[in-house]
Amino acid sequence: PDNATLLKIYALYKQATTGDNADKKPGFGDMVGRAKWDAWNNCKGTSSDDAMQQYIDLIESLA
């Protein structure tokens, strides 16, 4: 999968297991950390169950 899809998988996993992102945004020099933080932060407000279902649907679509 491409990077955007991998970030979405990461974000949905974090949202399903941890909930809304409350972590401090990584510094400008940490491009990977910032991309992951932004992806997770875009899921803010999504319930754990919804995030789990979206994660499953996305993984199944890759098969």
Where are these regions (language model features)?
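A charge-rich, low-complexity, intrinsically flexible signal that marks solvent-exposed coils, linkers
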Residues: 1-63
